């Protein structure tokens, strides 16, 4: 503590608050030579006052009391301020802890402003898988949740282009689905001794476009079309196969080509597992197979929209042998030791790797130990079925494949007679969504029975 402060606090009785140290130094000579006090009033002279000492301590005591009261007030204010700050700090910490507890650890907060979006899974965890019963129900259709980057595409003629992918637009209605079912019911009635199944496959537009874009493009709901068709099929004669949900579950995988209107071998595999589950059959596992690839596929949509990404065609070689007899459009028969044209090259025809493309009649015979002896299936299909039918060799001893457009050009027997002659036990009407709503192809299917 300084000398001045020592003076202030240790000699309070004689300290005059009206003077600072400079006044004190200036007036010191005057004090020495005269009788005036620091304040200009007469100094106290004990002799002149008759020996009576004035009450000089009373003002000093009042000052001490005032000063003590001020100190007490200041201390109270300091303590209360500290308590208030401490309470606010505790409240802030509690709020932060509660906020962190409510926030999911898997979600990252972003400051980026994005436009509203619908049906996107980019920021949400995938839902739990539905039960097998729900997956196969023909009245239950799980909406696909493809990843949405919130960009727009453009409509080019009959296709929509988005992210360098081509999407074939669907113009069928709910009523046209019912018309397809009526045709299948009539044909099934002509083959009463076999088990009849029907599968309608949605295309890339339904599975690959976010709902935000499906609502903008000139394309109708394929789920509604398929649902109405299946509901109209005769329950006593036709068993529908709901492959829609199996594809929806895998919509963010490479199940459709980018430059072609067909699906990939992987997409066809998921539909095959829906077929196997519906019939209660064991399904082939791709992990038991050997994958082969053909890069550089430029599909049917490339000419309609230049700039689409090229594709890679994948197919899986089975852990068992398959022989395949093909009857071409001239009626000539060819025999192969694989359901795949493994010499197929890159380019616009790479999809032809599956059963050598579209031929009037193809018969595959399997050595799979899961194939039930005597079980034979006939599949009426268009080109969407080419990638699908090889998987059936895992469960069937023989797989007979008829192209609905050309089968009767090489067969003297109609379809019903062919089934009876060849011991067919199961029949599958297989169509992509576009074919199921195409009148010419429906007429071609009906002509198989004439």
Residue ranges: model-predicted function:
Residues 2-28, 32-450:
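Extracellular glycan-modifying ectodomains
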